[in-house]
Structure formats: structure tokens, C-alpha cells
């Protein structure tokens, strides 16, 4: 058991400290402290020794050197059960320090400010704090280290009851090393980001557990959601069952798609694939257009809405089973409608804007693949008309909408659209012609005609069979990357059928 007789306290986050320090004082614990922490303690009538009085050495270099002293680290690292350590500490008059309460300069908070200057960031890099934390954590069998104000009450209760066992101290040791590792990762990441280097030679990733999820991809799998240090989610859950792993993935997909499309866009997601996308003058009309694409697949889906959900739209949504809705805003009337279906998960995210600097991380066996997210867009000027038949301005708008949709569909991907709504989606097939046929059949199965439709393909057509199938289905115009060794054959097929075809020069594979 660790007997706490002496504590060193030096914190940036002072929440809960006064009550905890008073408790230590009342239990006969001698307190050593520094700077602003010392002032807070003394202002509240808590006895404490200044660090320079304790070490006999003044703070120097504008406070950059306070606790980097053998009397401090000897007291933290000394193994009192080791006779040689004990003898040397007695010889050098180094008392044992049994408890360290330290949290670090607010580097993350500082660099999160939009106009932070390099000098300010540097001055908020803590040196002495991490050193004390690591020393105490290394010697956890004899020294307790606390880095989180939320733990003060637990330690008070333990000191008052069963005491501090080695097992308990070990749990705080693990937390302490995670704390300093996260701190160093934040500093490293920020400086790399300032340099413009996206893929550093050494990658440090730190994530904080945000919440435990209902379960993983399947009910027998456990799962949790973690947030990266520099990104705070503004997802606001308003109602509904606990989120599962799959729910989070589908909500994320719904957000990504809606955020990159025009105002009043609605998309419906099932297993990470959109089964309907549309935009209109208002979200209700867009929802009705998106749902008609594939009402069967929309059953149990997640809906993303770039706009406001009112009572009328909420009523329309609740006529069928859905897992959840993510939108910019829910009116009070909408919330009242949804409250009658309390299992529907509602998430509000007012800033429906994509973080364009995000990276795409994929774990693989023995490694991690990292790439830029596929956010690059094209304009009408990037289109190359390759057929004899030329597109009208309306055709260009329809093709651009189809192209904006196909990038979100699993490869091989084909999407049939009108100017502002999907008609049929062929997703995830191993051959492109199968996706062509699947998309047309999906539309026909729900009574939608693809005659005169705009068709987007996420990658080039390797053979003319896909073009022949599109012509047979009644498509009017095709947008695709181009780049196949058989492009001339494919263009010839389009000309034979009187189709419009444009090349983008950009592929949108999605695995």
C-alpha cells in the first residue's frame, strides 16, 4: 500500500483542486506546489511549500525551469524498499514524494485558436509537467500519479477507506502514460500540420474515447467511438436508442454525402450505400424523390438532410421504419412527431460542412493505409464531350448531378438520374455491365423509367457492352472518367446508339 505523506501539486486545470488539497491537508499530507497553483492553495487557506523553498533553487528562465531538480525527481523515482536508494536519499536529504497531481499546459486549447502564433504555441509546451508525470508513473509501486481532476474524489474515498494499493496505482500509471503520449502526439501533429506535411515519416495518432457503442458490426462484437484530438464532433443526439457501430457508419455516410451536395439535399443510406439521393426546392420534396428510387431498400435506412426538418417532413419520414435521421435542424414540431417513435435516432449537426482536410485511414494486416479523402470536384469546364451528339445546358446539369452521386456508391458503381434525383443505383458489382443492368432493373422494379436518363460510371467502361446495355435501357447521356485502352470502341458504341458521352478525366473508385 502507498502511504501518502507528501504530495507535489502543479496543475493548469484547477477544477476540483481546492477541495482535494484541503482533504490532503486535513489528512496530514505535506503539499509542495508551484506558481499559480501555489497561489490558489494559499488564497484558500491551504498550507503549501513553494517549490523553490523546497529545492533551494529558484524558478528560472521565465518559469521554464521550476521542477527539473534532483530533489524533485529523486523523491519521485526513489524506491524506498531498495536499501541503496534509501541510503542515498537520506544522504542527500531527498524526501520521498508519494503523490503527484499534475496536468499540463493547455497546448491543445492554445493551438485550437484560429490566429495562434508560433511563439504562443511553443510557450504552451510543458516540459516539467510531463517529466514529473513520467517519473511518478515509472515508480508507480511507490508513487501515485493523478492527471485527471475527475479522479480526485475516487482517491479521497480510497484514502479514507481501503487505501491505495499497487493495483490501483498501476491503473493511474497507465492513464498517466497515455496522458503524456497524447500530449506529445498533439504537439508533433500540430508542428507537422504547420509544415504542410500530410504524411510524416512517423505517424502519431491520439484519440479520446467519446462513447461506448451499443455493439459492433454484429451484436457479438463490442465497439466504442473515439474522437481525434484536434476534432470535436458537433453531432448532437436528440433522441433514440443507443448507437451501434453500423449506425455510426451510416450516419457518417449520410453526413458526408449531404454535406457535399446542394442545399435541401436528402440521401438515404443502407449499409454505407446510398439507395436514393435528391435535391429540390425543399427537403420534403427531396425526401420523396430520394425515397422513390428504392423504397424497399430505404426500409430501416438512415436519412441525411442538408436542411431543416419540419413537422410535415417528420410525419412523412415516420410513415415507414427508419433507423435514424441526421439533419441541420429539427423544428419543435418535428421533434414532437418523432417523440411518438422514440427508437428513431435523431442527430443534429448545424454546421453541415465537410472537413476537407480529413484523411481516410484503413487498417490492414500489419499496417495502416492512409490517403486523402476523395473530395476533389470538377466543373463543367473539365468535361470533354467525346461523342458526335452534343449535350444541352440541361444535359450538363443532369450529368453533373449524376457524377456528384456516383462517387459515394461502392464500386463498380453506376447511377441513373434525372436532373436532381436518382432513378436507379447499381452498386458493388464485380463487373461494370452487371452494375449497368442492376441499376436499370432496380428502377424498373419500382415503376421508374430510365428512358432519357443521365448515367454516371465511377470508372471507365472497359468494353462496349456497358454502353450497349445503357442504350437498351434507354439512357440519354453518359458521364465517365475515360482512360480505357478501348475508349475509341466505347465512343463508337455511343455514337452508334446516338448517345451523349462526356469524359471527366477523374476516377471515383470506392472500396
From Swiss-Prot:
Domain MGS-like: 1-147
GO cellular component: cytosol
Involved pathway(s): Purine metabolism; IMP biosynthesis via de novo pathway; 5-formamido-1-(5-phospho-D-ribosyl)imidazole-4-carboxamide from 5-amino-1-(5-phospho-D-ribosyl)imidazole-4-carboxamide (10-formyl THF route): step 1/1; Purine metabolism; IMP biosynthesis via de novo pathway; IMP from 5-formamido-1-(5-phospho-D-ribosyl)imidazole-4-carboxamide: step 1/1
Pfam families per UniProt: AICARFT_IMPCHas, MGS
Entry annotated with the keyword Translocase: no
Protein family membership: Belongs to the PurH family.
Protein known as: Bifunctional purine biosynthesis protein PurH
Organism: Leptospira interrogans serogroup Icterohaemorrhagiae serovar Lai (strain 56601)
Amino acid at each position: 500500500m502507498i502511504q501518502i505523506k507528501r504530495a507535489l501539486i502543479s496543475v493548469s486545470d484547477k477544477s476540483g483542486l481546492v477541495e482535494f488539497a484541503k482533504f490532503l491537508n486535513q489528512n496530514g499530507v505535506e503539499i509542495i506546489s508551484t506558481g499559480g497553483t501555489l497561489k490558489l492553495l494559499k488564497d484558500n487557506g491551504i498550507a503549501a511549500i513553494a517549490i523553490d523553498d523546497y529545492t533551494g533553487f529558484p524558478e528560472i528562465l521565465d518559469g521554464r525551469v521550476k521542477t527539473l531538480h534532483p530533489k524533485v525527481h529523486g523523491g519521485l523515482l526513489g524506491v524506498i524498499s531498495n536499501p541503496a536508494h534509501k541510503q542515498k536519499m537520506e544522504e542527500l536529504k531527498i524526501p520521498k514524494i508519494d503523490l503527484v497531481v499534475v496536468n499540463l499546459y493547455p497546448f491543445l486549447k492554445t493551438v485550437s485558436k484560429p490566429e495562434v502564433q508560433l511563439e504562443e504555441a511553443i510557450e504552451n509546451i510543458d516540459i516539467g509537467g510531463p517529466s514529473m508525470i513520467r517519473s511518478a508513473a515509472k515508480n508507480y509501486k511507490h508513487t501515485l500519479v493523478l492527471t485527471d481532476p475527475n479522479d480526485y474524489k475516487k482517491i479521497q474515498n480510497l484514502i479514507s477507506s481501503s487505501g491505495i494499493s499497487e493495483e490501483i496505482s498501476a491503473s493511474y500509471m497507465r492513464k498517466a502514460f497515455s496522458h503524456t503520449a497524447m500530449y506529445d502526439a498533439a504537439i508533433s501533429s500540430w508542428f507537422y500540420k504547420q509544415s504542410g506535411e500530410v504524411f510524416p515519416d512517423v505517424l502519431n495518432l491520439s484519440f479520446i474515447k467519446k462513447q461506448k457503442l451499443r455493439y459492433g458490426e454484429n451484436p457479438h462484437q463490442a465497439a466504442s467511438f473515439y474522437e481525434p484530438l484536434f476534432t470535436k464532433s458537433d453531432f448532437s443526439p436528440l433522441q433514440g436508442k443507443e448507437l451501434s457501430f453500423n449506425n455510426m457508419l451510416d450516419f457518417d455516410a449520410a453526413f458526408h454525402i449531404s454535406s457535399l451536395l446542394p442545399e435541401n439535399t436528402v440521401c438515404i443510406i443502407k449499409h454505407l450505400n446510398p439507395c436514393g439521393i435528391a435535391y429540390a426546392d425543399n427537403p420534403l420534396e427531396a425526401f420523396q424523390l430520394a425515397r422513390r428510387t428504392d423504397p424497399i431498400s430505404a426500409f430501416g435506412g438512415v436519412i441525411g438532410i442538408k436542411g431543416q426538418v419540419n413537422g410535415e417532413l417528420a410525419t412523412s419520414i415516420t410513415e415507414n421504419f427508419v433507423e435514424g435521421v441526421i439533419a441541420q435542424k429539427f423544428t419543435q414540431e418535428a421533434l414532437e412527431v418523432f417523440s411518438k417513435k422514440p427508437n428513431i435516432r435523431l442527430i443534429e449537426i448545424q454546421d453541415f460542412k465537410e472537413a476537407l482536410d480529413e484523411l481516410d485511414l484503413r487498417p490492414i494486416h500489419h499496417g495502416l493505409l492512409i490517403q486523402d479523402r476523395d473530395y476533389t470536384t470538377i466543373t463543367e469546364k473539365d468535361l470533354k464531350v467525346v461523342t458526335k451528339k452534343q449535350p444541352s445546358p440541361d444535359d450538363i446539369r443532369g450529368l453533373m448531378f449524376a457524377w456528384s452521386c456516383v462517387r459515394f456508391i461502392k464500386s463498380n458503381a453506376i447511377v441513373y438520374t434525372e436532373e436532381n434525383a436518382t432513378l436507379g443505383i447499381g452498386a458493388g458489382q464485380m463487373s461494370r455491365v452487371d452494375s449497368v443492368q442492376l441499376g436499370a432493373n432496380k428502377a424498373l422494379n419500382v415503376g421508374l423509367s430510365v428512358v432519357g436518363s443521365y448515367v454516371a460510371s465511377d470508372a471507365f467502361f472497359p468494353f462496349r457492352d456497358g454502353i450497349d446495355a445503357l442504350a437498351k435501357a434507354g439512357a440519354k447521356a453518359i458521364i465517365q472518367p475515360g482512360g480505357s485502352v478501348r475508349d475509341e470502341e466505347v465512343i463508337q458504341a455511343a455514337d452508334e446508339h446516338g448517345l451523349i458521352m462526356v469524359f471527366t478525366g477523374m476516377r471515383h473508385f470506392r472500396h
